[in-house]
Amino acid sequence: MQWSPTPGASACLGWASSLACSTAPTLLGRAGRGPLMAAKWFKEFPLNLKTVSERAKPGGGGGKLRKNSEAGGAGPGPGKGRKNSAAELGSGRAGVGPKDSRLSRDSLQGLIQAAAGKGRKNSRATEEEPHRGATKSSGCSTYINRLIKVDTQEKNGKSNYPSSSSSSSSSSSSASSSPSSLGPELDKGKIIKQQETVIILEDYADPYDAKRTKGQRDAERVGENDGYMEPYDAQQMITEIRRRGSKDPLVKALQLLDSPCEPADGGLKSETLAKRRSSKDLLGKPPQLYDTPYEPAEGGPRAEGKARPPDSRLPENDERPAAEYEQPWEWKKEQIVRALSVQFEGAERPSFREETVRQHHRQKSWTQKILKPALSDHSEGEKVDPGLPLEKQPWYHGAISRAEAESRLQPCKEAGYLVRNSESGNSRYSIALKTSQGCVHIIVAQTKDNKYTLNQTSAVFDSIPEVVHYYSNEKLPFKGAEHMTLLYPVHSKLH
């Protein structure tokens, strides 16, 4: 008996079928001689073939189909026809004895199963060539899809891909298309990162090669003051004055005093004055002396072509007593008045000085008011006429007490003097002198020949006017008054 190969079967299937069928009669003929050996060999033969087929394709669909055919289940078209023919063959030989029928049924069933398994494998290879991907095991396709999911989740965050039940062709196409779809998105991310610009918020964060923006250039205009010589509060005040400008006359006066002027068209421009101090409106308090550091103006042009002394603000030239350092505003009044008087220099300058002197003298005692006309009529270092009698000299006050002489010398300058009658019996006359430590009374001694001298080592004079005339040009020979001369005579109210 020889099996005819099916139309879809390959050459290998025909060879296997012919081999099995040609071997069957020989084995059946020898069944009488060694039935036990043949039965054992036929039982092991299909099992070996099954093991080889399952090892070649573990868990494949062919194994399941062979198992179904053994259990009597449905299978594919060619397998089903072969199974039915095998069943008919077995039923036709039912009349054989029990031993022979058992041998023939087992041997034929094993051969049919082996031939059917290989035939179905080859027929699937030829007939189902376009759908090869569908025959892949579910475990393998799940493994491929899992790899694709991990790749897409890490790179793109997308998980909407086909499940394990999808075909391998769609999974392979998605796997092949995923790198190409990820490519443009990665490129877009790189382009976005390249287009990002660094925003610099502060000037301290700038590297040395950073380009400055327009906002930074606007913030660093000329109006900003970043000097290190002045305190922070002074910088803020100066910046505010430069921006808004100040119409306060006191501030302009201080500008005249502190800043050099630039002459233009024969005059001064108030716009060119450097604003170094703030107004009282901005501060809420008067400007202080030490608001700005000492900056001497060297050779700078001043108003009316006069230069201010560069060391006028030095501490050693400060005329204030130690107790007045806490009251700078009162002391600065005279300085502000001098600053305001810069524009009035010329013919009005002498009258301004006289007014200052008169104002100073008004604040003194009533004795100064009495002596004020006498002081204004005589200049410093007035010459004495030695030929004029003593009674006609303006500095002779006659018989006045010691206390009265001191009171008359009190408002006078240092080295002021007067001559009076002495209260002591040793001399007739005495000279009252104003020194830095108070009033000194010098006794004029009279010799036996009616001449006058101050001490035993000094010169001798014939009259008191000659003594006064001599010591108005020479220094007095007394301890504590070696550097003094009789400079400022105090006129008597009788003359």
UniProtKB/Swiss-Prot annotation:
GO terms for molecular function: phosphotyrosine residue binding. This is SH2 domain-containing adapter protein E. Keywords: Phosphoprotein, SH2 domain. PANTHER family: HEAVYWEIGHT, ISOFORM A (PTHR15127), SH2 DOMAIN-CONTAINING ADAPTER PROTEIN E (PTHR15127:SF29). Residues 148-157, 208-224, 301-327 have a biased composition (Basic and acidic residues). It comes from Homo sapiens (Human). The gene is SHE. Residues 135-144 have a biased composition (Polar residues). The modification Phosphoserine is found at residue 107. Residues 162-181 have a biased composition (Low complexity). The keyword Phosphoprotein applies. Residues 51-190, 203-233, 256-327 are annotated as: Disordered.
